[in-house]
Structure formats: structure tokens, C-alpha cells
Amino acid sequence: MSQLLSTPLMAVNSNPRFLSSSSVLVTGGFAVKRHGFALKPTTKTVKLFSVKSRQTDYFEKQRFGDSSSSPSPAEGLPARFYVGHSIYKGKAALTVDPRAPEFVALDSGAFKLSKDGFLLLQFAPSAGVRQYDWSKKQVFSLSVTEIGTLVSLGPRESCEFFHDPFKGKSDEGKVRKVLKVEPLPDGSGHFFNLSVQNKLVNVDESIYIPITRAEFAVLISAFNFVLPYLIGWHAFANSIKPEETSRVNNASPNYGGDYEWNR
């Protein structure tokens, strides 16, 4: 039975198999640290009177989360969040989901990046008014380099990405995916057009969705923000401890001879 939903189903342990030469597929979420702020009490006593409606309570819970109903993460494990941004139009819907990079543990106890993260684009055709058939969705994975192409795209520029999931294998050429991003004729935004030709299951489909200038700006802003996380640089930055760096440098004064400015 077809899934007629306004939003896609998001599996926690998704493992899509759409590998290509220009994109890497991994799974996982992002760990988020929470920071609190302490307010210092004052010596003055001030009486405050306020009126708060039930509607305000509702929106506050929707915005910040209701701690009484939200599940708590397992003890000792960081909270994991799975997010996505969706754009709905008359004939199709587009959802963009970030996928975290992968690391491997070294014998020294450190971790090394093994696979870059990526952005998973899911296109679903319309199945009625404000309904989309996500069982017939087509997916396209954007590598970090392809993301860089998009964020540097000018208002009148276009780009095209080609993927062959079976490149280098016996079924090479039987599945072709082409994503085109081109400006709208009136300059009001861009359109995303995903064409999929799959000779293995006799599929030849094209899904088109227009993106307004404002919607495109939101996507580009999100892409710029998440890009350092997709290449794992946030993990390196979070691991830097000034006291340890100072101790290593003092113990080895000649350390850093390979740096260009020390030559």
C-alpha cells in the first residue's frame, strides 16, 4: 500500500544504497551539547505581574520541547537528533536530510575520519492536494564538493550533477541520475529537476520542483552551516584543549618544524 504522507518517514538507522563516484553514503546523527545560563540573584525585591494564556504555553512547549513528554536519552550516551528541511509544492515535495561523517578508532585511542558526511535529497511526487507519495520517492546524495558548487551558485547560474550508483561494477550504466539546478525564467528563484533512468526496474521518471529565492536562501544558509560538520572538523575543534596543547609544546620545543612558517 502506498504511503500517502505530507512528510517522509525518517528511520533512525537508515542505510540507503545509492553509492556513486561523487557521493558517499553513511548513517548517523549529530550529538548536540546543551548549555545553560545561571542567573545571579539581586538584592532588590521586585513584584512582577504577568498574564499567560494556555495558547502561549502550547507554543512554548512546541518551541522548546515539553520535558514531561520527551524521551530522555540513555544514561551515559549523548542525545541524538535527526532533522530535515522540507519544501512542499503543487506537484512535488523536497526534503533535505544531513548525514553525519564516519570515524574509525585508531590503536592510539584517537579517531580518524573515514567517510565524509553528505546531504540526502528526497523527491516525492504529488498524490493529491497536500499529499505526497513517499513510497515512490527518488533520492540523490550531494557530496561536500557538490554542496560547494550549490552554495557558490550565482542567481543566474546553473549546475548539473550526474550519478551512476553502479559505477565500476557489472551494472554500470543501467541506472542514471541527473540533478539539474537552474534559475527560473523570471529570476524569482531556481528549480530542481531530478531525472532517474533505471533499466533494472524499467523506470524513467523526472521530478520537478520550483524553489523560490527565499527558500533557496534558507537551503544555502543551512548548507554553509552544516558543511564543516560533514567533513568532521567540528570533532577536531571540540577536541582541542588549551592546557594539553601548551603542555605538549613546552615538552617538545622543536615540535612544529614541519610547519611552513618554521622553515
From Swiss-Prot:
Q: Which UniProt keywords apply?
A: Chloroplast, DNA damage, DNA repair, DNA-binding, Nucleus, Plant defense, Plastid, Transcription, Transcription regulation, Transit peptide
The record, for Gene3D superfamilies, names: Transcriptional Coactivator Pc4, Chain A (2.30.31.10)
Could you state one GO biological process linked to this protein? regulation of telomere maintenance
Query: What range is the organelle transit peptide?
Result: 1-47
Q: Where in the cell is it found?
A: Plastid, Chloroplast; Nucleus
What molecular functions are annotated in GO for this chain?
A: DNA binding; mRNA binding; single-stranded DNA binding; telomeric DNA binding
Q: Name one GO cellular component term.
A: DNA repair complex
Upregulation details from the record are: By salicylic acid (SA) and infection by H.parasitica.
Q: Where is this region: Required for ssDNA binding?
A: 89-94
Q: Where can the motif Nuclear localization signal be found?
A: 167-180
Record note on disruption phenotype: No visible phenotype under normal growth conditions, but mutant plants present a progressive lengthening of telomeric repeats.
Query: Record's family?
Result: Belongs to the Whirly family.
Q: What function does this protein fulfil?
A: Single-stranded DNA-binding protein that functions in both chloroplasts and nucleus. In chloroplasts, maintains plastid genome stability by preventing break-induced and short homology-dependent illegitimate recombinations. In nucleus, modulates telomere length homeostasis by inhibiting the action of the telomerase at the extreme termini of chromosomes. Is recruited to a distal element upstream of the kinesin KP1 to mediate the transcriptional repression of KP1. Is required for full salicylic acid-dependent plant disease resistance responses. Can bind double-stranded DNA in vivo.
Subunit structure of this chain's protein: Homotetramer.
Identification of the protein by name: Single-stranded DNA-binding protein WHY1, chloroplastic
Q: Origin organism of this chain?
A: Arabidopsis thaliana
